[in-house]
Amino acid sequence: MDNKTDHKNDLNSQPVPSSAPHKERLTPMMEQYIEIKAVNSDSLLFYRMGDFYELFFNDAIEAAQVLGITLTTRGKHLGEDIPMCGVPVHAADDYLQKLISSGYRVAVCEQTEDPAEAKKRGSKSIVRRDVVRLVTPGTITEEKLLDPTRANYLMTLARIKTSKGEEFALSWIDISTGIFRVTESHPEKLLADIMRVDPQEIIVADSFFHDKSHKSLFNVLDRIVSPQHVSLFDAVTAERDICSYFKLSTLEGVADYSRSELSAIAAAIRYIEKTQITHRPPLMRPERQNENATLFIDAATRLSLELIRTTSGQRDGSLLKAIDRTVTGGGSRLLVDRLIAPLTTPSAIDKRLDSIAFFLRNTSLAEAIQLILKGGPDMPRAVSRLALGRGGPRDIASIQRGFEIIHGLNQLLNNELLPQEISDVQQVFSHLPTALHFRLEQALSDDLPLLKRDGGFIRPNYHKELDEMRALRDESRLIIAELQAQYAKETDIKTLKIKHNNILGYFIEITNLQATALTNTPQAKARFIHRQTLANVMRFTTTELVELEGRIAHAATHAMTLELEIFDTLVHEITEQVDFIRKAAEALAILDVSVALARLAEEQEYCRPKIDQSLTFRITAGRHPVVEQALRKQAAEPFVANNCDLSVQKNHQYAAIWLLTGPNMGGKSTFLRQNALITIMAQMGSFVPASSAHIGVVDRLFSRVGASDDLARGRSTFMMEMVETATILNHASSHSLVILDEIGRGTSTFDGLSIAWAAVEYLHEVNQCRAILATHFHEMTALTEKLDRLYNVTMKVKNWDGDVVFLHEVMPGAADRSYGVQVAKLAGLPTAVITRATDVLHQLEQGETAGKGNKLIDDLPLFSLKTTSLINEETNKHCMLHEALKNIYPDELSPKEALEVLYRLKQLEKK
């Protein structure tokens, strides 16, 4: 989760004057601003003034700094200039994005009446304004503010105190798509559950937030937590409020929610109503998540494996980046959902794998589907914007385009023998509302404006009256010319003209001599109404011309009104189909992910894993999905594949544990991570980077690879290591997979060895889980003699002319040394240090063998002038050799000359 500065508390103490005192010193507009600001003190106030949103006082100072806009002043208060800045309404989304990403909440205050209406109440009356929406990180819907590849979750965290202790529940909503989920949680897995969902904003009761016993949790979550009054989580009225929102008489038959779940759900609904104010987004009914249905991955493991983002927060370098071949926003979001919550039911996993296998066998069909899907619209987000009154013509077009894609895919899949998951997708597509699809095709213009107020989005010939209004608006000159010709013919006055001015409007003009034709009979007088007489001309009008003038004058306004009415009708029809649209969008995402994973499997030569309920863990020629692709991009040496078999061996009841030794840089951490990632990929329903894989479902995955201090909570690297190790030992079951790298390295040798030794014994005897443990404590390899399911494996290395070559192969056996000095040499440590380290290591090893370690350490000489001199001589020798080699050109030497050169080099080496 991003660590950005939290400005919410700053806004509570802004020096905005009270709305009560000093009113006589403020303009009516500023009085109104202060009254509205007082109710929204925890948010920046976007105060609508014509075509701008304006901010005042500290709001202006803060916003100007973040947005990089000019800070100016408007008026004075108590003799001081009032700071002010503003942003154009048409560009507000861009500025909102910057403010939200910087940790601010924004209250959007709009004019709620026309200025003309305000004047009717008195010349000094000001336009009414109200806050119509609170914009927060978890409640945004605008396309510009959202990442199309990422869900935007608002989470509520409820705590219920009972006689037995505390009960917790989480609910999370993506207001932009309508997704609504809920689950119970427990103190020990609360952080893991939150990190799995990865919300943009978390709502908690203020009493919970300030509870010191949970301080560490909220320190980790940092700025994304928004404390609210405890009444938001009231469980007593929760069921009533939930039923009211979803128009239900009772929750019976919907779900048997716990009290804590009801509190979390109700809090989410109340917060949505609080922030959206005038609109209720169409949410799905809360779907309960079964905690046992998905692979549990704790927060530390999720971070260290870099599933969605790297430890530095980047998408590049993550597993998601390596496997994502989706072509739609919905598909990308579904892939993330699957990646963060792998399944634990083999039949459900196989259902997904069947889809991938189908598209691998039908590559032409897969290519055709991906071509149709590519660049497809984000229907759930479009329909949410429309339902919230924030949508435009292009959102309606997104629905129409989505329907078109569904129609095409339905025809493409109709005659195929499909696997279950894709058959279900096709079944959803078959219920396309064809009448609405046809109406949208007929209604929408080809060239659509961004905003509905710009008009012109309804196609000609769709609505007769609208066509007439547009004709009057756009073709008024032609209509007047036709009427002028009609009157000229009727009166036999060829010079008759229809003209216009701001006083009379449209009128007929003839000379005084011609006026007789319009006034000589009662019928003519009744038809042509006299308006004005000038020196040489007379002016008339007709009932027809007056009516036409009125119609022309109001044509543009009426055309816009009609177009907006049609827009609202279409929006209503679309929102009536919201359930289908969401199901169809989910089906499109499933199709996108299935085809994308098939493409990945073919491209990277992945295999289908066998998944069952056994304790098997057998990977043949497994590879690290991220590292392998990185090496290919760099045109480096190919990735070295390795086997891993933690399965139950003959005459044993439980699975094996591998104890991995070997040098740094040998590939131990990569091997550990790749097996964890293969497990996640297999259980999310993906093919995996191996030649074969058989995995008994893993219920919990623990991976402790890498280490860092947690300075914010005062924890050292070693303390963090011990906390994470405690979590593993306390919660791993026989169906779990544990990946541990260098346990005990953060303390003294004997302390570390003792802890690592005891932890391995505990995993073997108590947890009885599948595990791979990497260590530098070579003494631990002796444990295989007493623990019958513990096996020694090592990273293969090769000595070549005094240097070490890492082969990155895992083989049976134990390493006899760590090759730390050789790695230091590769890293470029000074020759003096390497020479000295080699000498110290040699003497320490001799001392350990003889049992005289401490004495030898005391006897070891420090760097001396003699040592330095020898090192300098060695350096000079290398320089001479280097110079000699630099002046040799092998292609120009005869065999005899080459032999002479070799002798000279040999002489240099002996000096």
UniProtKB/Swiss-Prot annotation:
Give the residue ranges for region: Disordered.
Answer: 1-24
A molecular function (GO) term: mismatched DNA binding
Gene3D superfamilies membership: 1.10.1420.10, 6.10.140.430, DNA repair protein MutS, domain I, MutS, connector domain, P-loop containing nucleotide triphosphate hydrolases
Which keywords fit this entry according to its UniProt record?
A: ATP-binding, DNA damage, DNA repair, DNA-binding, Nucleotide-binding
| Pfam families named in the record | MutS_I, MutS_II, MutS_III, MutS_IV, MutS_V
Q: Which GO terms describe its biological process?
A: mismatch repair
Biased composition range(s): Basic and acidic residues = 1-10
InterPro entries, sorted: DNA_mismatch_repair_MutS (IPR005748), DNA_mismatch_repair_MutS-lik_N (IPR007695), DNA_mismatch_repair_MutS/MSH (IPR017261), DNA_mismatch_repair_MutS_C (IPR000432), DNA_mismatch_repair_MutS_clamp (IPR007861), DNA_mismatch_repair_MutS_core (IPR007696), DNA_mismatch_repair_MutS_N (IPR016151), DNA_mismatch_repair_MutS_sf (IPR036187)
Per UniProt, ATP binds at 662-669
GO CC annotations on file:
cytosol
Q: Which PROSITE patterns match?
A: DNA_MISMATCH_REPAIR_2 (PS00486)
Record function comment? This protein is involved in the repair of mismatches in DNA. It is possible that it carries out the mismatch recognition step. This protein has a weak ATPase activity.
Family, according to the entry, reads as follows:
Belongs to the DNA mismatch repair MutS family.
> What name is this protein filed under?
DNA mismatch repair protein MutS
**Organism, per UniProt?**
Bartonella quintana (strain Toulouse)
